[in-house]
Amino acid sequence: MTHFSHLAWREDLLQGKRCRWLRKSTDLDHDKRTTESGSRSRGKFNREPAMLGTSQAGHSPLSHRRTVLVRSQNRRTSWCNAMSPLDITDPSILSRPADLCAEPLSDKGLQRADGCGRLVLSCSEHGTRIEDIFERSPTRIMFPRPGSRPVEEAVIINTGGGVAGGDRLECSVTALPGASIAVTSLAAEKVYRALHDPARVSNRLKAHESSRLAWLPQETIIFNWARLHRTTEIELFSGSELLALEWLVLGRAAHGEIVVGGSISDSWHVKKDGRLIWADSFRIADETFAHLNRKALLSNCNAIATLIYFGPDLDKRLEFLREILLSLECNCAVTLVGGLIVARCAARLSSDLKLALRSILQQFGPEIGSGPFRVPKMWSC
């Protein structure tokens, strides 16, 4: 008779890692095993595995048939039917497989990213220069034109390749008086599926008087069951000029992915001279994704963008921007709130939204004096 010890070796990680059970036998004749029906088996594996811990009717609980997961020497996993003389009342044996099924998956306690990037720019006789810079992995800040040339564009890089649940990323950009800078990202940011904790992204922008700051990152792609909590805090001073953009893409269209669950929280807080002039919060919870096709919500639009502008001649530039939006094929609207131009754009595909945003920057940029307010170079890479 073949005797099976209880758990001989186990390696389990709660996120889909393997759980290996090794079989130990005290019987030298491994090829001949007696089943409870009295028939003989030649070590063949049963292709219809039974539940571990279930017993056949009419047999003693100490001699019922079990199915044991075996990791063989050739590293192939098979199901083996055999007699087990184990005491099924032993909690150390029966509780362990149940724990693996009953215990919910969690990403708590796993290693998470804690990135930070701070950039301060000032104005000199040769143009904008770097006053201070700080980086903490996985956040990097690069410049397309290094050396003694004036800084025109800064590129935020996430070397981790994406954002997972529990990650924290912070970015701070300060334009001192007279500085002019455009900040973008190297590629689209990806937010992966999260089990428990959301990914937290915090962006802080500060534009002092006579400075010009453009915040134009590429899209953020939300994977199915991703959890994102993002805040964008902007502090403006009289005489400054700012153009800021954030856009979200729900799912990967090339994969045919449809986001059916998750959590998204995207909020803006804009202050002028220390006073709050605009606050906005966009949230989608698990139960909301099933209703995004409604016209009152996203009306089947999987790509959405928010664009804000602060500067002089707001009324004139509002009308100019409205004419641009009317010529676009995606759904767009613009308004003036608290001394701030706010535009919304939505499209079914991210490619359509990107074309619309490029068109806005190409036409609206020269109207407000170009400089940093143009299509970033990284958008064409």
Task: Enumerate the predicted regions with their spans.
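N-terminal, charged/glycine-rich beta-strand/loop interface patches
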Residues: 79-219, 224, 231
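Acidic (Asp/Glu-rich), glycine- and aromatic
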Residues: 223-231, 236-263
